[in-house]
Design a protein with these regions (language model features):
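Transmembrane beta-barrel wall of Gram-negative outer-membrane proteins
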Residues: 23, 287-391, 419-420, 430, ...
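Short, acidic, small-residue-rich periplasmic hinge/interaction motif at the N-terminus
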Residues: 29-34, 41-44, 75-76, 92-141
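Periplasmic N-terminal accessory/gating domains of Gram-negative outer-membrane beta-barrel systems
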Residues: 117-118, 126-175, 184-202, 206-218, ...
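Surface-exposed extracellular loop regions of Gram-negative outer-membrane beta-barrel proteins
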Residues: 185-186, 386, 445-447, 464, ...
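A beta-strand signature from Gram-negative outer-membrane beta-barrel systems
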Residues: 202-245, 901
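Outer-membrane beta-barrel signature, preferentially recognizing the C-terminal barrel domain
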Residues: 403-424, 566-577, 625, 654-711, ...
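Gram-negative outer-membrane beta-barrel transporters
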Residues: 706-710, 729-824
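C-terminal beta-signal and adjacent terminal beta-strands/loops
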Residues: 713, 820-827, 849-902
Length: 902
């Protein structure tokens, strides 16, 4: 890496070209706010991508080629002003401007409509252009135009990013290789099964912008191989704001179906999670096995946002609050299969699944700005998510006799709460030295209360509970508590007084401590012989009278009533501590070349202790990891001219196993089970990127990126043939590689200014190749010698086209958004089992909105128009056809929304 850095410095230094330029600078003030400085306004040279945005003090400054130019000053809801000026090489021209509201627009309306330009596409493209590191930023404006409703939809519209089974996959690297931050502070997952929080919690109402950092820099935590996704939460910019949003919608294959719901749940997602049984001779569970039913399902959401700014002498205090409720139904039917290692199908069942997802969110931002460049802010985020599902499965499943059928019903609720508290302070010591301090206290409380699973054998023309294993009919209670603490401090020192020179020295430190306690209690029903059961009234058998009459015995996962430890839950406890220090030097070598070199030191300790339901885990097991990392990084930026940029970046990072990936707790699903691996080792990642950017205008660009990743000890999800077809996590080889190319373009296709008509298009696509040489000596006994990485998508395309038409005070926007990803590996096969593959699918969404008089807005959204099949399949045995293991459709979602700005 050092050799490459030297070569890059020498090569780029040889092509530095001096250009004759001058500096234009000035101050923008706000007539509507008593001539106060106007922050975040756009200042652009007309017809080019040259420009800047004003800072908090209304100031701007940038270099332009010598000659005569037209400068445009603009801000949302304000008049756009143009000025012609002439500048000579080495000259500084000062252009100050007083900005005012558009004619016929009152101050209150301006306040409602205005938003920070850090949400606007043009401003974020300028930010991307000026940045030293390679990054992609998506603002609230672009999300609205493309009909994106949350952060997950946003990042999957960027090159090289696709949606995975839970979260996103970046350049072929899934959940464990990525990281998520909120305002630059680490954010834990709301779901113990995953490292990253589900991005669909973050609706556009709370997003200012989203940064996708595919290149590691020293300020980031080192546990990232794919990308860091940083969500910047909204804050109040103008004097006041109040709006409400509501929508109703349907799913085409759900709306009129008879829909089953779980006893003990409700539409708000609140229920009792405690265990009501403390005596195995008493059947005192609160909830019934029999579900309820309804026949009309209407999706609904309601949200509000409000805030106000107060002057406190010469200082400013502001608050901003967002709240929301969302409930959605989904009905799917399909088929599941399982095979032996030789490809023989032993499970083939049709299924219907009823899903209801409800969430509530509350975000608050309090901010106090004092003196010049000083501010302190408190951010709070509360997310409650409740997922309820009932799955019915009918068919054969490893039958003992010809004609045997099995009916399975699984009723599951996952209830998770996330509490985020952040304190962020910025202090400016001098014009060249400032300090930023951040801290967070995050808490997760999750439970899976009373999951009910039944398996009934159909033989001799009647159903009976399975007698082969007591665990075939169970009630499962799980609870998770996690506390996460983080702190960060960073000094930034500007090395030169020249405002245009970006040379800066940054240094600081991080601390993070995370602790998790997971516990699960399982109740099994041990039937000694077959007994007839009405599957529509199972509580007639699962009752106190059946225990009294010795039809079944109630026991826990640890044994029956005679076991003194019967009620001791299965547990694992995880603790992780990270100490880090970092430094970064940005140095400008002339007008065209900037180099950034950084390093990060991390000391990480992780201990997972467990007492679980896997026999070989022993009574008290432990998985300990203790690592020290020194992580170098560099970024080189060369401007051929104002609109043409080349960037090169390299870094080293790592991927650390998560708590649940090392804890050998077995989690049972319908056709798979999963468990951790206490022998899992971290991965080391080496990353190299080269990116060319061409800016056609302030809102148009074309980029090409080539990337290469080398991973030592890569981690993949792998299948181990055992009871229930178990998935686990393995270091699948000594090394793996991923390389590919990404192309992105944004273009104004057609525009008639005097008719206020604009048609815009966006396209990004990626092609990648991944390979891992599987460890032939592994105890996993991999079926193949090589494989693609789990989740690696060879081909990915995102495209959108939008039309924007204004009619006097009304605005119509409509967008068509397309996405496609090709087939990819879901899990790596072992011991004769072939890889499980996830079928590539296309999606197409239509989003239209109509704004009336700047206060009222109607929005029509139709998603998943193509309604493709979602499939998992196992690669064919000895070159035969793939066996489809799971197949279903999700239906088309249609919603109509209304919003009002007060």
């Amino acid at each position: 890496m050092k050799k490459f850095l030297c070569i890059a410095f020498i090569a780029l230094s040889q092509v530095l070209i001096a250009q004759d330029k001058g500096t234009v600078k000035g101050l923008l003030t706000d007539k509507e706010m008593s001539n106060e400085p106007l922050a975040f306004a756009n200042v652009l040279i007309k017809g080019t991508a040259i420009g800047s945005t004003t800072d908090f003090d209304g100031l701007y400054s940038f270099k332009v080629p010598a000659g005569t130019h037209t400068v445009q000053f603009s801000f949302v809801g304000y008049k756009t002003i143009e000025k012609v000026f002439t500048i000579k090489a080495g000259e500084t021209v000062t252009l100050n401007q007083l900005m005012s509201a558009e004619e016929g627009v009152g101050l209150d309306e301006v306040v409602v409509k205005s938003s920070t330009s850090k949400e606007k596409t043009s401003a974020l493209i300028l930010k991307q252009k000026k940045a030293v590191a390679i990054t992609t930023t998506i603002g609230a404006q672009e999300l609205s135009v493309k009909g994106v409703s949350d952060a997950e939809g946003a990042v999957t519209k960027t090159a090289g990013v696709s949606k995975g089974s839970k979260n996103v996959v970046v350049r072929g690297l899934g959940d464990r290789y990525n990281s998520t931050t909120l305002n630059g502070l680490p954010l834990p997952s709301e779901d113990p099964e995953y490292k990253n929080i589900s991005l669909d919690f973050f609706g556009t109402g709370i997003i200012k912008n989203i940064e996708v950092n595919k290149v590691f820099t020293s300020e980031l935590y080192g546990d990232v191989g794919g990308a860091n996704i940083n969500i910047a939460s909204k804050e109040l910019i103008k004097k006041s704001l109040l709006n409400v949003n509501a929508s109703l919608g349907v799913n085409t294959q759900t709306v009129s179906k008879e829909f089953l719901t779980i006893d003990g749940t409700n539409r708000f997602g609140t229920q009792k999670a405690s265990i009501s049984v403390n005596d195995l001779s008493k059947y005192s569970f609160r909830n019934s096995f029999k579900p309820h039913s309804q026949d009309f399902q209407l999706n609904n959401s309601l949200s509000f946002a409000g805030g106000k700014k107060y002057d406190v002498g010469e200082d400013t205090f502001s608050f901003f609050i967002v709240g929301g409720f969302d409930g959605s139904y989904n009905y799917i039917d399909g088929n599941i299969k399982q095979t032996t290692s030789s490809g023989e199908i032993f499970q083939d069942q049709s299924f219907t699944k009823y899903e209801y997802n409800v969430s509530q969110i509350l975000m608050a931002n309090l901010q106090y700005k004092f003196e010049e460049g000083h501010n302190i802010a408190y951010n709070h985020l509360f997310i409650h998510n409740n997922k309820q599902s009932i799955g019915d499965y009918l068919g054969f499943n490893n039958p003992e006799q010809d004609g045997d059928l099995e009916f399975q019903r699984r009723q599951q609720t996952n209830n998770n709460e996330l509490y985020v508290n952040q304190l962020i302070a910025n202090y400016k010591f001098t014009e060249r030295l400032d300090f930023k301090a951040k801290g967070s206290l995050n808490f997760i409380r999750g439970n899976e209360p009373d999951r009910r699973t039944n398996k009934y054998l159909f033989r001799d023309n009647y159903y009976s509970p399975e007698t082969s294993s007591a665990g075939e009919n169970e009630r499962y209670f799980a609870k998770l508590e996690e506390n996460d603490y983080a702190a960060k401090g960073k000094f930034s020192y500007k090395l030169k007084e020249d405002e245009e020179d970006v040379s800066t020295l940054e240094f600081g430190g991080d601390y993070r401590y995370t602790e998790r306690l997971f516990s699960a209690t399982i109740f099994n029903h041990d039937f000694s012989s077959r007994v007839a059961i009405d599957i529509e009234n199972p509580d007639a058998v699962f009752s106190q009278s059946s225990i009294d009459n010795n039809i079944f015995e109630l026991e826990t996962g640890r044994g029956g009533a005679s076991n003194p430890n019967a009620f001791v839950p299965f547990t694992y406890r995880g603790k992780r501590q990270i100490f880090a220090g970092f430094g970064n030097l940005v140095y400008q070598l002339g007008d065209n070349f900037i180099a950034s070199v950084g390093g990060r030191f991390e000391k990480i300790q992780q201990r997972v202790t467990y007492n679980t339901n896997i026999a070989q885990s022993a009574i008290d097991g432990a998985s300990n990891l203790d690592r020290t990392y020194v992580l170098p990084s560099f970024n080189l930026k060369y401007n051929f001219n104002e609109n043409s940029i080349l960037r090169i970046a390299g870094s080293q990072s790592y991927t650390f196993p998560q708590f649940k990936e090392t804890a050998p707790f077995k989690y049972q699903d319908i056709s798979f089970s999963s468990q951790g691996n206490p022998d899992l080792k971290p991965s080391d990642n080496y990353n190299l990127d080269a990116k060319y950017e061409y800016y056609m205008s302030s809102s148009e660009l074309f980029t090409v990126t080539g990337f290469y990743k080398y991973i030592q000890n890569p981690i993949s999800r792998s299948e181990i043939p055992s009871g229930g077809n178990t998935l686990t996590y393995l270091n699948v080889g000594d090394d793996a590689s991923v390389y590919g190319i990404e192309i992105e373009a944004r273009k104004n296709i057609y525009e008639i200014e005097d008719k206020d008509l604009k048609i815009m298009g966006g396209l990004n696509t990626s092609y990648l190749v991944s390979n891992v040489n599987l460890d032939a000596n592994s105890v996993a006994q991999f079926t193949n010698t090589t494989s693609d990485l789990e989740g690696a998508t060879p081909f990915l395309i995102n495209a959108d086209i939008s039309i924007n038409k204004k009619y006097n005070d009304n605005t119509f926007i409509s967008s068509l958004v397309f996405n496609y990803f090709s087939e990819r590996v879901y899990s790596v096969g072992t011991r004769g089992f072939a890889n499980i593959l996830e079928k590539g699918i296309p999606t197409l969404d239509l989003v239209s909105s109509y704004e009336f008089n700047e206060n009222y807005r109607l929005k029509l959204k139709v998603t998943n128009l193509l309604n493709p099949n979602f499939q998992l399949s196992r690669a064919g045995f000895n070159g035969g056809d793939n066996v489809v293991l799971s197949n279903y459709k999700k239906g088309v979602n249609i919603s109509l929304g209304f919003s009002y700005d007060f």
